[in-house]
């Protein structure tokens, strides 16, 4: 028979019971390492987590289709082929991400970081058509955008990926010419149209204060985040 509690006995009060439940869940799922949907660390750290989290098996061959200086892979021991259109970065392969020099089903993972810095005045060093090897110029009336790159890249990424392969895309929305460019939405639509299944989205938040702009008046919120989009060459994500 249960002992009856005395009216003078102090009753234990748990201030945050949900924390106690979560602690028990963590102990019972010791092998489970959740990936947060908001990330404040570096891209290299996040990529390493995603490469452990999303592929069904450990990827043997990875393509970074826009490797630039290779900052995503600093300290990494993974087998990564870095491609860039600019030979000054000394990539493994000099090539155009809209027309890749690889055979069908060559990679387990493709990583893509498309340009998101539009033309800025008369400074030629900031001309994205020169810096990124773009052939087509978007219209000033549309505020300049890079959306014409997405369909041909997605077609090539789908071709060079193996079955159930993963596409990771880091992408940022931006404002140019007072026009908001919904880059992440346009990329998702382009990838789905090619045959990819859109599986996940991680918001990467930039640390540090927002820099003071040179403009007197702002019409849009300042961008302080970007997205890592996850796609699979499959009909389902799991």
Stretches found by the model and what they are:
Residues 1-238:
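Class I S-adenosyl-L-methionine-dependent methyltransferase catalytic core
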């Amino acid at each position: 028979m249960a002992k009856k509690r005395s009216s003078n006995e102090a009753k234990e009060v748990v201030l945050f019971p949900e924390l106690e439940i979560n602690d028990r869940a963590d102990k019972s799922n010791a092998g489970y390492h959740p990936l947060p949907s908001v990330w404040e660390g570096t891209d290299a750290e996040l990529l390493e987590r995603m490469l452990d989290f999303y592929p069904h098996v450990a990827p043997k061959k990875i393509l970074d289709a826009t490797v630039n200086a290779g900052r995503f892979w600093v300290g990494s021991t993974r087998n990564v082929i870095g491609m860039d259109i600019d030979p000054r970065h000394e990539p493994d392969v000099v090539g155009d991400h809209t027309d890749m020099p690889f055979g069908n089903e060559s990679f387990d993972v493709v990583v893509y970081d498309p340009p998101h810095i539009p033309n800025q005045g008369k400074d030629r060093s900031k001309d994205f058509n020169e810096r990124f090897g773009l052939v087509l110029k978007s219209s000033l009336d549309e505020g300049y955008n890079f959306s014409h790159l997405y369909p041909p890249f997605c077609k090539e990424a789908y071709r060079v990926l193996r079955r159930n392969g993963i596409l990771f895309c880091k992408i940022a929305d931006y404002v140019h010419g007072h026009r908001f460019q919904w880059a992440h939405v346009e990329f998702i639509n382009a990838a789905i149209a090619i045959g990819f299944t859109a599986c996940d989205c991680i918001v990467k938040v930039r640390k540090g204060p927002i820099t003071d702009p040179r403009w007197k008046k702002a019409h849009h919120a300042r961008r302080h985040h970007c997205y890592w989009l996850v796609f699979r060459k499959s009909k389902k994500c799991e």
